[in-house]
Amino acid sequence: MVKHQTQKKGVKRKQLKNIPSGVVHVKATFNNTIVSITDPAGNTISWASAGKVGYSGSRKSSAFAATMAAQDAAKNAMNSGLKEVEVCLKGTGAGRESAVRALIASGLVVSVIRDETPVPHNGCRPRKRRRV
């Protein structure tokens, strides 16, 4: 019995072109830094993380890895015509400030820097203290 193979349709990506302004979300944890660039409506233009750039293990948590991730995300977003961004920081990792510096150095105009780090109003019980 002959089985007919159906062609798989390739996933078509949306082409987001000429987006002059956007929002950069920087999530800096103790283990990694994730940089997502969206349009004002929240649709993702580009993203990068320290792991995606090529770092693994404890090197992902370094400030230099966050710089490389921010440069990679900014370069891809500027190909879509992005010029001006608002920066939303979340978390207390090592890559917070270095990611913002890399965005400015890559040629993006930063209009606002917002800190949206979630702070509990005495919510869940924290995990146990580390004993080294």
Swiss-Prot record:
Keywords: Ribonucleoprotein, Ribosomal protein, RNA-binding, rRNA-binding. It comes from the Bacteria. Pfam families: Ribosomal_S11 (PF00411). One of its GO terms (cellular component) is ribosome. GO terms for biological process: translation. The keyword RNA-binding applies. GO terms for molecular function: rRNA binding; structural constituent of ribosome. The keyword Amino-acid biosynthesis does not apply. Located on the platform of the 30S subunit, it bridges several disparate RNA helices of the 16S rRNA. Forms part of the Shine-Dalgarno cleft in the 70S ribosome. NCBIfam families: PRK05309.1 (NF003698), uS11_bact (TIGR03632). Part of the 30S ribosomal subunit. Interacts with proteins S7 and S18. Binds to IF-3. HAMAP family: Ribosomal_uS11. Belongs to the universal ribosomal protein uS11 family. This is Small ribosomal subunit protein uS11. It comes from Chlamydia caviae (strain ATCC VR-813 / DSM 19441 / 03DC25 / GPIC).
